[in-house]
Amino acid sequence: MPSLPHRCSVLLSFDLEEFDIPNEYGANLNGEEQLQVTRNGMQQLLPLLDQLQAPATFFTTAHYALQNKQQVKALAAAGHEIASHCLYHSRFDEKDILQSREILANISGQPVNGFRMPRLASIDKNLVKQAGYTYDASLNPTWLPGRYNYLQQPRTVFRSHDLWVMPASVTPRLRLPLFWLAFKNLPLSFIKQCSLAVLKKDGYISLYFHPWEYADLAGYTNLPFYTRRPCGNQLLQKLSAYLQWLKSLGHFTSFSNYIHLHENQLLHSS
């Protein structure tokens, strides 16, 4: 395999959203509980990011931001990127694409350049472009049974509808995904092996997780085991080991900063 590029980039992202996944499996969590579980996860997660000095991109629902304005302002002030995860996580209207961007920009004081559709659902990129975004991060170019099949889509950053499309990383040949469920359920040694293959091939890696994963989810027994365990501190320790290893191989950067630094190269290769 080829050697690692001199400066690998780690694009770390979190979907900062309501903890509504139990309701997909028959629960009836109210809105405040959904928000509080995510807050609990953020309390666990943020000290780790501070310790590692790891800037991340937080794809944030405008609803969460409106209920947690000081936290979102603090994220922006700490050097993290605030991007849009639409208005709500559980329901969608086309007008939410623009409205969420305006709300998040107003709260964070940052330009909001990026969009990620909840549950990585398909989205008309013309709508994303018209709402003023410069990139879309709604693509996981793999096959996830019951959710989506994007095996024919490009694996790495590409241009479409005058937008940058920022896929989540998958391995070069088999397209094994490196998203949150894989990280939660597979051995760290295997995740590192797959990550190394991506870094050697692509020169960067794009990852996404959820803050609520780092809260205590033991009581949500209606969730499938593979989405619920490990969680809390146990999962945080695994994430810590993984991120420290990635830091030894490269540097953390936001999605917008990666595009800014590599735009000429990306345009040439698109």
Question: At which residue positions do the language-model features occur?
Answer:
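Metal-dependent polysaccharide deacetylase catalytic core of the NodB/CE4 family, i.e.
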Residues: 52-124, 133, 138-139, 170-172
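C-terminal domain-boundary segment and adjacent tail
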Residues: 2, 48-52, 188-270
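Active-site beta->alpha N-cap acidic-glycine motif
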Residues: 2-78
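The substrate-binding groove and active-site-proximal loops of carbohydrate-active enzymes
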Residues: 30-36, 60-61, 86-91, 112-113, ...
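Active-site-adjacent pocket scaffolds in enzyme catalytic domains
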Residues: 4, 22, 106, 110-204, ...
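Conserved, mostly hydrophobic/aromatic
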Residues: 15, 49, 58, 85, ...
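Short catalytic/ligand-binding loop motif for oxyanion handling, primarily in non-cytosolic enzymes
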Residues: 20-21, 65-68, 91, 123-126, ...
